[in-house]
């Protein structure tokens, strides 16, 4: 779905982990992101059922997935798993997926929580929010979502 320049878009972002997947929601017009929920990564069926419910509820125009990398920019053990998850999201829900370098997002999320700006039980969702905020901060004002 293509949106005219300056139109509002809803986005969901994911911080993929083997045990938990942090989810955040954001808005392209306000360029703001917030932690939403943590999905337990119990099985493929459970994961995609939970994500499907979130997509049905929030009706996002696009998805963002954090891409784990080592500090020097080389692929991390989780890089391929996160890419696969994003590809599966695209295939199952027919929504565009953008991958964002998530180096230090968990470190930033922990710092936010220590500073009193988040909840410890929402660490993964806080990391997803940081990933999404990085994406939103990089958007031009006339970006179109396809």
From Swiss-Prot:
UniProt GO MF annotations: nuclease activity
Main location: cytoplasm
Name of the top EC class for this enzyme: hydrolase
Gene Ontology annotations of biological process type: rRNA 5'-end processing
EC number: 3.1.-.-
Protein name (database record): Putative pre-16S rRNA nuclease
Assigned keywords, A-Z: Cytoplasm, Hydrolase, Nuclease, Ribosome biogenesis
SMART domains membership: YqgFc
Cellular localization per UniProt: Cytoplasm
Database matches in InterPro entries: RNaseH-like_sf, YqgF, YqgF/RNaseH-like_dom, YqgF/RNaseH-like_dom_sf
Gene Ontology CC terms: cytosol
Function, in words: Could be a nuclease involved in processing of the 5'-end of pre-16S rRNA.
Pfam families hit by this protein: RuvX
Statement: the UniProt record of this protein carries the keyword Metal-binding: no
Family per similarity comment: Belongs to the YqgF nuclease family.
């Amino acid at each position: 779905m293509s949106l005219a320049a300056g139109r509002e878009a809803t986005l969901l972002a994911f911080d993929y982990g083997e045990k938990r997947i942090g989810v955040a929601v954001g808005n392209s017009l306000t360029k703001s992101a917030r932690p939403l929920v943590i999905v337990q990564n119990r099985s493929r069926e459970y994961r995609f059922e939970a994500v499907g419910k979130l997509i049905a509820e929030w009706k996002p125009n696009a998805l963002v997935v954090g891409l784990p990398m080592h500090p020097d920019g080389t692929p991390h053990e989780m890089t391929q798993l996160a890419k696969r998850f994003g590809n599966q999201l695209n295939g199952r829900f027919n929504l565009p997926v953008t991958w964002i370098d998530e180096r230090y997002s968990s470190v930033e999320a922990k710092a936010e929580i220590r500073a009193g700006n988040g909840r410890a039980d929402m660490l993964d969702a806080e990391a997803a929010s940081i990933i999404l905020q990085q994406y939103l901060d990089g958007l031009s004002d006339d970006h179109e979502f396809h």
